[in-house]
Amino acid sequence: MEVQKNPSMMTMLIPWITFWIAVSVNTEKGSVITLLVASAIPFIMRKHKFVIWDQLSIVAVAILSAIASLTGAGDISTDIGYLVFGLFWLVSCLTKEPLCAAYVKYNYGGEAAHKNPLFMKTNYILAAAWGVLYVLTAVWTFLLKKAGVGATLIVVNNLMPVLMGIFTGWFEKWYPARLARGSKKQ
């Protein structure tokens, strides 16, 4: 039997990204495409271990896609999707392992990373930041659509995660180094 690879955040992200793009472009066809992608993820990513966030994401995206398909309310479904995704990140901060740590801990000794306070603190901060970003994304998406400037969302909702990804890459190096040097009050 083949040994499974470590979890990949792509397992969680592929259904969400497909959902936000496909349902935004065409609610009816996009929701069907998203359901097909979500149902294929366990096969596509079969060589990787799954974590709870992968499983919850597949279920949440499938439910939101079904709602969009049945009601034609793609806008509301995608807005709720941003909220749910953000809440996943925030709720994970109430557990022993923030969402991002479930994936990146394997780069830092696996389960042993939980004993590293710098690793854990950094990941709790990043999980909270991603959670806040997506909860705010749900809010501004709803408000901008109501204000009639929904076209702006194409730029904003794609740019913000890119900027947050750049920030994450910087922060995960800078923050632990700063704490290790003792130059940050705790």
Where are these regions (language model features)?
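Alpha-helical transmembrane segments of multipass membrane proteins
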Residues: W16-I21, A40-I44, I63-I67, V139-L143
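Structural signature of hydrophobic alpha-helical transmembrane segments
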Residues: W20-V37
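C-terminal ends of transmembrane helices
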Residues: A38-K49, E172
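Cytoplasmic-side transmembrane-helix entry/capping segments in multi-pass membrane proteins
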Residues: V51-A62, S77-V84
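Membrane-interface helix caps and helix-loop-helix hairpins in membrane proteins
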Residues: V25, H48-V51, S69-I76, A151
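C-terminal membrane-adjacent module
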Residues: G109-Q186
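Membrane-proximal helix-loop-helix units in multi-pass membrane proteins
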Residues: G72-K121
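Short, amphipathic, aromatic/basic-enriched membrane-interface segments that mark the entry/exit
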Residues: M1-S8, S24-K29, M45-Q55
